[in-house]
Amino acid sequence: MLTDLHKVRNIGIMAHIDAGKTTTTERILFYTGVNHKLGETHDGASTTDWMEQEKERGITITSAAVTCFWNKNQINIIDTPGHVDFTVEVERSLRVLDGAVAVFDAKEGVEPQSETVWRQADKYVVPRICFVNKMDKLGADFYFTVDTIISRLGAKPLVMQLPIGSESEFIGVVDLIEMRALVWPGDAKGDVTMGAKYEVQEIPADLQAKAEEYRAKLVETVAESDDALLEKFFGGEELTVAEIKGAIRTMTVNNEIYPVLCGSAFKNRGVQPMLDAVIDYLPSPLDVPAIEAHDPRDEEKVILRHADATEPFSALAFKVAVHPFFGRLTYVRIYSGRVDSGAQVINSTKGRKERIGKIFQMHANKENPVDFVTAGNIYAVIGLKDTTTGDTLSDPANEVVLESMTFPEPVIEVAIEPKTKADQEKLGTAIQKLAEEDPTFRTEQNQETGQTVIKGMGELHLDILVDRMKREFNVEANVGKPQVAYRETLRRTVEKHDYTHKKQTGGSGQFAKVQITLEPLEVTPETSYEFVNAVTGGRVPREYIPSVDAGIQDAMQVGVLAGFPTVGVKATLVDGASHDVDSSEMAFKIAGSMAYKEAARKANPVLLEPLMAVEVRTPEEYMGDVIGDLNSRRGQIQSMEDASGVKVVKVNVPLSEMFGYIGDLRSKTSGRAVYSMQFDSYAEVPKAVADEIVQKSKGE
C-alpha cells in the first residue's frame, strides 16, 4: 500500500456495452502481474465479472474495485457497468473516481451508451483518456472514431498515437511524443509473452508524413496551453518530452483535452502504453479539488476535506456487496485522514457508531488484508452493520456529511409468488440483502393478493434482481409481468353519506352506524390522506373512532375503480350511532370501510398514472422522427435545446407508453440517440385509456 499519493490513481474504465471494457481491465491486471491466467469475457471467466449473471450475459453489473501496481505506481480500478439500467452504479462509481479511461470500439466509434456514460462523467467533472480498442476488428477505423469523439461528444481529443495497420494487419502504434514505433511481435507462432514485450522501431516510411502532421498538431495544442511554451515554440525551439507531457497532464486534469490512444486488448497490443498514460496524465488524489462536506448539525456550513493523512478521517461508502466468505463487504473511498482496523468511527449520515473490522485491498474476488487505510485510497471493509451505499463515515470528534448520493424512485414493478413456505422465508432474506446492496430496489407486500411486489429502474434491472434471488438465494418463485404502478383518486365531494352495519344472529350481534363526508385532497410528498373527527355529543364513542379511520384506510388500499391504491382523500366522520351491547371496534371498522366504498363510487373516482420526465439526446437529423414517436406515446414536450452537437428534448411521458422504448428509439435513430428517464409526478389518465385499464383489471 502506497502512502505517497502522487503515485496513486483511482480510475474507472467506462464504455458502451461490448466495447471491450472488461477485456481491457483483464489485460491491465495481467500486465501488472495480478493475474496469471487471462480470463476472456467470451468464456465467462473474467476476474472483475464475478457475479454469475455477469458471466452469462458477458456484461459487467457490479463495480468491483481492483488494486494493481505499474512501474511503482498504484492503480485502483473501479469496474463500471455499461448498461443503461445500471446508470446508478455508474454514477456511484464516478463519484469516487479521480479519472477514467473511456474505451471505444474502433469500428463503431462513439456509441449511444458511451455517450450516456460520457455525459455522466461530465456531470462529475472526471478527467479522461480515450482508448480506441478493437483495432484488430474487421472495419476498424481509428480516424473515424476520433471524428465521432468530436461530432457526437463535442469533446476535444488529442491524438497521441497512430495505429500501424488495422484489422488483421494491426501490429502496433506510432508514439507521437517520442516519434517512434512500438511493435508487438505477431502471435501466430504462439507468442508466449502474451504481448507483454514489444519492440521499439523506426516509424514505417508510409506513415512518416501522417505522423509528422499529427505530431505538429499535438505540439501546437501543447504550446497554446502555456505562455512560456508558446514563446519557445514561436522562437523555433523544440519542446522537450518532459514539457510536452507536463502540459498534456495539466490540460487533461483540467478537462480541457482528452488524450487518445489505440490498441487491441483482445490481441494484447497497446495496453502498456495506455497504462503509462494513466500514470502520466490522469490525476492523483492530490490533483483533484478538496471535497465539500457539510456539518451534520448545520446543512449550510461547508467544510473542506483534503487528501491528507493528518486531517480528520472521512470516507464515503459507495458500494455494499455480499461476499460468499466474509459476508457484508462495504467499499469505501477515503477522502481524508487515516483509520486503523478495529477503530470506532461514526456513520454521520445516520448518526450511528460503527466499528471498522478487517480492511482489505481488493483484487476482483481475492483480498489482501491491511492494518490501516489513508486518504486517497479505495478499500473494502467488513464489520460495518448499519452503513449502506452513499453513507459518510467520519471521525467521531469531527463529524462531516459528504454530499449524499440521491437515487431516483423506482418506476416499474413485478409480482413474485414464492412456491413454498420455505421459499417465502428465503425471499425475505434475499430482499433484505439485495436492498442493502442496491438503493434503487424497493419492495412491498400486496395486501389483497399476498404477493411480494419488487420495484426497480427498468426491465433489465428487474430481470437481474429476480435472477439473483433464484440463483444466489435459491428462491423458487413464479414471476409476473412487469406492471405500471397506477393510483386512484377522487374528484368530487360527497356530503354526509350514511352506512349502517348490522348483523343479528342469536347472541350478541354487530352494530355500527357512521356518516362520512369525502373530499378531494391535494397530494404532497408528506400527505395523501387526512381523517377528521367531527362527531359531537358522543354519538360515536371515542374508543371506536380510530377503527373508523382504519376501516377507511383499508378500503383505500383497493380502489373502487380498478383496485389500485387510492390517494388524495380527506375523510370526515360527521355522525353515527352505537349500541351498548352489539357495537365493537370490528363493527365500526367494517362500517368505515363500507361507507368509504359506497361514497367513493359517487365521488367521481379517476385513475392516475406515473408520468416520467424523459430526456432524449438525438442527432438533429432524427429529431422529427423522435418527436413524432414521443407524441404518439402521449408525450408532452417540455423543452428543446442544443447541446454539443445534439438536440436535447425534455418531455413528460406516461410510463405505460415507455415499455420497449429503447428498441424503438434505437431503430429510429440507428442507435445514435440516448435517453434517460425518472419519475416526475402522477397525472390523470385520459378517459378512453382509463376505460381500457379498468376493463382489463376486471378481466373483461
Curated annotation (Swiss-Prot):
Its main location: cytoplasm. PANTHER family: RIBOSOME-RELEASING FACTOR 2, MITOCHONDRIAL, TRANSLATION ELONGATION FACTOR G-RELATED. Pfam families: EFG_C, EFG_III, EFG_IV, GTP_EFTU, GTP_EFTU_D2. The keyword Translocase does not apply. Belongs to the TRAFAC class translation factor GTPase superfamily. Classic translation factor GTPase family. EF-G/EF-2 subfamily. Signal peptide: none annotated. It is found in: Cytoplasm. The lineage of its organism: Bacteria, Bacillati, Actinomycetota, Actinomycetes, Micrococcales. One of its GO terms (biological process) is ribosome disassembly. Residues 6-286 form the tr-type G domain. InterPro entries: EFG_II, EFG_III, EFG_III/V, EFG_IV, EFG_V, EFG_V-like, EFTu-like_2, G_TR_CS. This is Elongation factor G. The keyword Oxidoreductase does not apply. It comes from the Bacteria. The gene is fusA. One of its GO terms (molecular function) is GTPase activity.
